[in-house]
UniProtKB/Swiss-Prot annotation:
Gene Ontology terms for molecular function: structural constituent of ribosome
Annotated GO CC locations: cytosolic large ribosomal subunit
Entries under Gene3D superfamilies matching the protein: 1.10.287.310
Family: Belongs to the universal ribosomal protein uL29 family.
Keywords: Ribonucleoprotein, Ribosomal protein
Name of the gene this protein is made from: rpmC
GO biological process: translation
Species the sequence originates in: Leuconostoc citreum (strain KM20)
Keyword Ribonucleoprotein attributed: yes
Annotated S-S bridges: none
Pfam families: Ribosomal_L29 (PF00831)
Protein name: Large ribosomal subunit protein uL29
Keyword Lipoprotein: no
Cross-referenced PANTHER family: 60S RIBOSOMAL PROTEIN L35/50S RIBOSOMAL PROTEIN L29, LARGE RIBOSOMAL SUBUNIT PROTEIN UL29C
Length: 68
């Protein structure tokens, strides 16, 4: 799980890369769920929340850069 404090230290490019990784993981988890191979269904919710955290930090950085 990614913590917001850890994410704030990353650059915009790193955050976008992390978002893409989480989205790919979510896709794979949903595929596993559909095929009946997923054991830990709570992981889907965790990844969705991680994506939301990353997007929040990205937007905060964009707004901070716009105000400069």
């Amino acid at each position: 799980m990614a913590k917001a404090s850890e994410l704030k230290e990353l650059s915009l490019a790193d955050l976008q890369k992390r978002e893409a990784e989480f989205k790919e993981e979510l896709f794979n988890l949903r595929f596993q769920l559909a095929t009946g191979q997923l054991e830990n269904t709570a992981r889907i919710a965790q990844v969705r929340k991680d994506i939301a955290r990353v997007k929040t930090v990205i937007r905060a950085q964009e707004l901070a850069n716009a105000n400069k």
